[in-house]
Structures are given as C-alpha cells and as structure tokens.
Amino acid sequence: MKKLLSIISLLFFVTTFSAKAEMGIGITAAAHMVDGSGSETTRTSGQVNNGSHDETAVIPEVFVEAIDDNSGLTVGISYIPVRDIGSKSRTDSNSEGDSGTYKADAELNNVFQIYADIPTGSLGSFPIHTKLGVQRVTVETLESLNSGSEYPNRDLLGFTVGLGTKGDLPFGNNLYYKGELTYTNFETYEAVSTAGNKVVADLEDVAAKLSVGYKF
C-alpha cells in the first residue's frame, strides 16, 4: 500500500507540474547492462545453489515529459513494454528423482518510470542534469525446471539515479535530444516455488541512453 501511495503522489505531482510547463514526447534507444545474482535453497535437502548472470541489450522506450521553461526542471513518465534479463542453465544429477537440466529465465514486463531531470550545472557548453526516478516492474519468471516447480511473478520497485545533458536539435525549433547514463537498483525478488524451494535474487541495471523528443 505504501508503494502504491508513493506512486500516486508522484503521478499527481507530474500532472500538476505539466499544466504549467511545455510538453515533450519522444523515443529512447538505451543500451542496458543488467547484473543479476541470487540463490535458491531446496526444500528437501537445504542445499543452496548460488548463481549470477550478466546481460547486455539495446532496448527502446517511449516517454512523455513536462519541461519548465524558466528553471529547466523536467518531470516525466517513460515506458518499456518488456525487457529480457537473460537466462542461465545448470545440470544436476542426484538420487531424489529430479535430476536433469534446470533453466532459469526472466523478463521485466511493463516497466513504468516516473522521473525528474534536475539542472545541476554545465560542462563547457553542455548543460548537465541529475536524473532521479522510481520504476515499477513486473518480474515474469519463464523458468524450465526438471522438477516441475514454478516461481510466481512479482511486482518490484527500482530506484534510478543518473547524469545527462540535453539540447535543441538543428532540424527545427521543436526537436531536442537527451543523452544520459543511469544506474538502477531494484528491490530484492523473494519467492517460494510450488515445490517449496526458495529463491532470493538481486538485480542492478546500468544504461546509456540517447533520446530524441518533440516539444509542443
């Protein structure tokens, strides 16, 4: 409930701010470097299996934002339909009847982010802004386990911080660009499978983003 109230409060702020500012819409190409690590504890033996996985992918996203003409402060919402965070397999051989290949796979679905770009200075002729954001994602598990067990999907929050620059493009008064480098740390995913095994996983994301927008 506290998470939902926080998101509603941020949405209210974005809506109120946008009524007093210039609007912008655009698309982003982002190179994501995802780092995931976790452990699975089996119910029957208590064995702990640790693992980690890195994944790199270029993923598009769309955004709409409100830009204050006086201060340059920008608040907005971005959306990614789906983001694959990779898969990993292992092969076990034991006497409990569940020997075989185990494949863990997951996606981040419906990635919504509420963010603020806060002007913080300049580097030469390039203005610099600090990005602060909150993401809401659905972790959809797509595992293929020889034991037949499944893990539930979970909704998580991610907290983003980054630096960027922006400016007008020379192709018209209404076109602009943004370049950003961001870091996101997601809440810990914890779940118990249908077979009683427990998994705990942490996820981090570093992204380099290039955006093109249109102001109106």
Predicted regions and their residues:
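Periodic glycine anchor positions in long extracellular repeat architectures
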Residues: G133, G162-G164
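Cleavable N-terminal export/targeting peptides
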Residues: M1-G24
